[in-house]
Amino acid sequence: MSTIAKDQTQINDKIRAKELRLIGQDGEQIGVKSKREALKMAERVDLDLVVVAPNAKPPVARIMDYGKFKFEQQKKEKEMKKKQKIINVKEIRLSPTIEEHDFQTKLKNGRKFLTKGDKCKVSIRFRGRAITHKEIGQRVLEKYADECKDIATVEQKPKMDGRQMFIMLAPTAEK
């Protein structure tokens, strides 16, 4: 949990509001009470008074075990982080006049990236007068995409960017 979120949570004596809309430990609405009354009620059951909605008028406070509440929040954050998937974009560089063996080697590397779940940017850099024959580069990229069509989909068709032409491949969704 970030330090900002910790500092913003108002508990027990750190509550600044004079009146609070109080919710009991089992979730029932108790009503609007003064801060002093709410604190006494929380102390009677050996729990904390925690403000859960500070922007409401009056602020909403709940009688609960703050340690348990904090632990549950941290657990939820960890679950959210686990569900997030980081997608890397790996780049493979080819030339318009690439030989077959070199092409197969680059293809093998690209397939490895795609099976791991990474996206793959296949680019061709045109040097010198080779830029006049863009169709050769486009054929190489289309051949690459065709060889990977069983494990990848074309996310972006061949496109020129300065002296480079590239294609984006994304792994197909697993069933």
Swiss-Prot record:
It comes from the Bacteria. Keywords: Cytoplasm, Initiation factor, Protein biosynthesis. One of its GO terms (cellular component) is cytosol. Its main location: cytoplasm. It is found in: Cytoplasm. Belongs to the IF-3 family. This is Translation initiation factor IF-3. It comes from Staphylococcus aureus (strain NCTC 8325 / PS 47). The lineage of its organism: Bacteria, Bacillati, Bacillota, Bacilli, Bacillales.
